[in-house]
């Protein structure tokens, strides 16, 4: 008997077949660099920086920016941002810089140039006759890179959220050490003309390069990161959520995974912790792998590890976390089952802690405490099973465990308890639910059961 086949009759004829469905056609690519070569892009001929500044600023004022010219200018302007490397800097076996080296963002990557000239048109007229200062170059670089952050803000953010962000960014780049070079609201007007620029590979690459540089190098113009910070751990929302989750419940990654009671977690956990990646290495290329073009499809995104993502945010919802209530449910990854497990884990970690004395008046008190704890452990090991169950917790120190939670789920037939449902409804009904969010899912799914 083939376990994958089903048997049925059609017009009295027995049919045996294997039901097959559409599968994920994408192949997840891990970002580890194997050839010891720095990430690389190719741009047009390097421009005269003064001419390029005037052209790009003119285009910004007219809301008519040429992406190729902008990328060429951003790459050339890297020379203005020189800093000192604080420690030897290596990633995936590549030596980026030695301690004490003077480096620029260009030191992190390879930028090849062709002989193709840029347009460098003066779309908005010619206003600046003198050559720009370094502060003016820094302001223009900051405003241009901020177009990346604005284009990453989703339409789900309601009201004037994006406009307010743009206004705050403009204020940064008109305050020392920067200098005002555009009129108020220019950034938002320009953004509307290039709202999808985060999808342009070269622009994304340069945004990630600047961010990787300023995140490590102390610099007068480090505030440029305000526009590029979204490139850090981009398309890593699954891994980032898991990291936040284990800190929230105060467990190690290993301890937390023991609570993941579902077969669909197996592939996702394997995917998320693929060996050979620099997930835990500070200032690694890994942090900006998406923008630097090291992976076409991230294995760490919410879609790549959707069951893990759903579970984490159902636990977050149970604990009343606004970030989880606002997050978008991955509908294809068993949200109903994940909400059940999330209820039990939420109950396990909500309003309950593991505490012990860690600080003492003197060494004598510390030694007395340790001796008393040893005695308590010996009593627990010698327990003959007659100890009152309330005292059991006290003596064993084992107030929470994966086994206990799993047993509770099985005893309840894999269903949520009334108390879980009441908690879910309580936190979601008091929240302004966004479309397709966890708050909306919980409201629609459980409000009638409460």
Swiss-Prot record:
Could you tell me which residues carry Phosphoserine?
389
Q: Which domain of life is it from?
A: Viruses
Primary localization class, coarse: virion
Please outline how this chain is modified post-translation.
Phosphorylated by host CK2. Unphosphorylated protein N seems to have a better affinity for leader viral promoter encapsidation. Phosphorylation of protein N in ribonucleocapsid may stabilize the interaction with protein P, thereby playing an important role in viral transcription/replication.
Kindly give the SUPFAM superfamilies that the UniProt entry links to this protein: Rhabdovirus nucleoprotein-like
Methyltransferase is among the record's keywords: no
GO terms (molecular function) for this protein are: RNA binding
One Gene Ontology cellular component: helical viral capsid
Instruction: Spell out the subcellular localization from the entry.
Output: Virion; Host cytoplasm
> Keyword set for this entry?
Capsid protein, Helical capsid protein, Host cytoplasm, Phosphoprotein, Ribonucleoprotein, RNA-binding, Superantigen, Viral nucleoprotein, Virion
Quaternary assembly: Homomultimerizes to form the nucleocapsid. Binds to viral genomic RNA. In nucleocapsid, binds protein P and thereby positions the polymerase on the template. Protein P acts as a chaperone on free protein N to prevent it from aggregation before encapsidating genomic RNA.
A further note on this protein reads:
Displays a superantigen activity in human and mouse, activating mostly V-beta-8 subtypes of T-cell receptor.
User: What job does the chain carry out?
Assistant: Encapsidates the genome in a ratio of one protein N per nine ribonucleotides, protecting it from nucleases. If expressed without protein P it binds non-specifically RNA and therefore can bind it's own mRNA. Interaction with protein P abolishes any non-specific RNA binding, and prevents phosphorylation. The soluble N-P complex encapsidates specifically the genomic RNA, with protein N protecting the genome like a pearl necklace. The encapsidated genomic RNA is termed the nucleocapsid (NC) and serves as template for viral transcription and replication.
- What family does the database annotate? Belongs to the lyssavirus nucleocapsid protein family.
Q: What is this protein called?
A: Nucleoprotein
Gene it is expressed from: N
